[in-house]
Amino acid sequence: MKHSVHFGAGNIGRGFIGEILFKNGFHIDFVDVNNQIIHALNEKGKYEIEIAQKGQSRIEVTNVAGINSKEHPEQVIEAIQKTDIITTAIGPNILPFIAELLAKGIEARRVAGNTQALDVMACENMIGGSQFLYQEVKKYLSPEGLTFADNYIGFPNAAVDRIVPAQSHEDSLFVVVEPFNEWVVETKRLKNPDLRLEDVHYEEDLEPFIERKLFSVNSGHATSAYIGAHYGAKTILEALQNPNIKSRIESVLAEIRSLLIAKWNFDKKELENYHKVIIERFENPFIVDEVSRVARTPIRKLGYNERFIRPIRELKELSLSYKNLLKTVGYAFDYRDVNDEESIRLGELLAIQSVKDVVIQVTGLDDQELIEQIVEYI
């Protein structure tokens, strides 16, 4: 049986990446620091995924195990030494924390003489995630390890898309996911092109697909959350049931469409249909997606290369409209949740500094005209 190592045994790891790896005949070693999840994986060796749609079908994922990377790093290194593929779904901010362990696993492959080509795919909500991870891993590799990695270890970027809401069940491994899923991998950085996963799309140039996803799904989802929160909605579905909010989301997506068409020459009709499907996904009545989950970490989401500021910058450069995105940024700056550290921190910054200084600090912008435009909406 083929073997995989997946970093991140959370809902997305189990409910998306794990499902695809299982369907492709892999044994999956889930690596995490959550003892409860790791214990359950080892005790049961399987878990169930429910597809949130009419009929609510279930998939049983088997041949799984768990490794606690904090308590047993040597087991992770051993797993990396023999594995056929490595994936992650841990969040962009956590990638640097697994770099040293990955490097040790790569060194172990080198010492063992394992020259089977291996690809490491960071399945995260970020542009260039796998290459970012590689830059972190390189910091811990020996000169020999660097040469070995350049020859045998690929870090192809990936774009992933599936809504997996925050949830709690008596069975800690059980996870509910939406029917839609998309996983796209760039081919030019593959070291093992013969290992092709079914239900995964492979593209020579991934950037258009990553931007289509991040600027459409992530921007649209976050727009639903921040405007929804402003109007008191508790779930994304509740937000979409407000015609005013839905209209604003559609206006944001229209601006995103104009950027994607101008930049990547996407077909207008196909992109309109893609955005229509996104709205339908947000309106899935079988998914309970809390506004608080989607809106969390607003400081990160207001970053220079993130889902709002980057498309706004690029639309401005192209002299295209971005008024509705600006309005959403205003709602994001106003978002507060006592359980979200970043939203509280944002409020504290706005209380002690000028709005302009906070905008510069959070967004990283130096375009004075754009900074002033954002300030007007806060």
Curated annotation (Swiss-Prot):
* EC top class named in words: oxidoreductase
Q: Which HAMAP family match?
A: Mannitol_dehydrog (MF_00196)
GO molecular function terms here? mannitol-1-phosphate 5-dehydrogenase activity
Q: Gene3D superfamilies of this UniProt entry?
A: N-(1-d-carboxylethyl)-l-norvaline Dehydrogenase, domain 2, NAD(P)-binding Rossmann-like Domain
Q: Which reaction does it catalyse?
A: D-mannitol 1-phosphate + NAD(+) = beta-D-fructose 6-phosphate + NADH + H(+)
GO BP annotations of the record are: mannitol catabolic process
Keyword entries, A-Z: NAD, Oxidoreductase
Entry protein name: Mannitol-1-phosphate 5-dehydrogenase
- What domain of life does the UniProt record list for this protein's source? Bacteria
> Gene encoding this polypeptide?
mtlD
Q: What are the leading ranks of the lineage?
A: Bacteria, Bacillati, Bacillota, Bacilli, Lactobacillales
Q: Identify the EC number(s).
A: 1.1.1.17
GO CC field: cytosol
InterPro entries this protein is in? 6-PGluconate_DH-like_C_sf, 6PGD_dom2, Mannitol_1_phos_5_DH, Mannitol_DH, Mannitol_DH_C, Mannitol_DH_CS, Mannitol_DH_N, NAD(P)-bd_dom_sf
Q: Where does NAD(+) bind?
A: 4-15
Q: Which family does it belong to?
A: Belongs to the mannitol dehydrogenase family.
Species the sequence originates in: Streptococcus pneumoniae (strain Hungary19A-6)
